[in-house]
Amino acid sequence: MMKLIVLAAFIGVCAGGALPGYVAPQYRFAPDYYPEGRYRPNVEGNAAVLRSDSEVSEQGFRYAYETENGIRGEATGVESDGIQSQGSFAYTGADGQQYSVTYTADGNGFQPQGAHFPTPPPVPEAIVRSLQENARDEAAGIFDDGSYHEAKYDPASIAAKAQHQYHYQPNTRYFPRYHY
């Protein structure tokens, strides 16, 4: 009888263990912590809206908002060949610095401006000279459409240009031997 009770208890424990069913896998790419210096989103609550104005009419729209955590924005827009709008927004970054962006959005796209945006490097001098030369050629009526013109690449024509422009003098005394 004792063996029967032990066997029944063992079967009961085994049957009551893990029940078959779906268990969602843990997302392995989500970090459990955020290293220092990285942005950590504020998950403790939402900021209260201090001001929210909105006006929409057939002529266009206008809105403005401000929240208690320092986020603010405003925009106006009119319908003329699509929607043309301009506005600005500002917020405090994770580093404590105030960031402000003004923008224009129209047929030319979205064009933001801000003091914190990176500035492009200066144009190299060779490119500036090339652009100036292209402008001079265009003003003189010289256009290069990019297609091949045999006369333009004729060796006699190239030599004549070189002599005229650069005082090119061909070397007739020395010709290196070609070894194949």
From Swiss-Prot:
It comes from the Eukaryota. Pfam families: Chitin_bind_4. Keywords: Cuticle, Signal. GO terms for molecular function: structural constituent of chitin-based larval cuticle. The lineage of its organism: Eukaryota, Metazoa, Ecdysozoa, Arthropoda, Hexapoda. This is Cuticle protein 3. InterPro entries: CHIT_BIND_RR_consensus, Cuticle_Struct_Prot, Insect_cuticle. Residues 58-121 form the Chitin-binding type R&R domain.
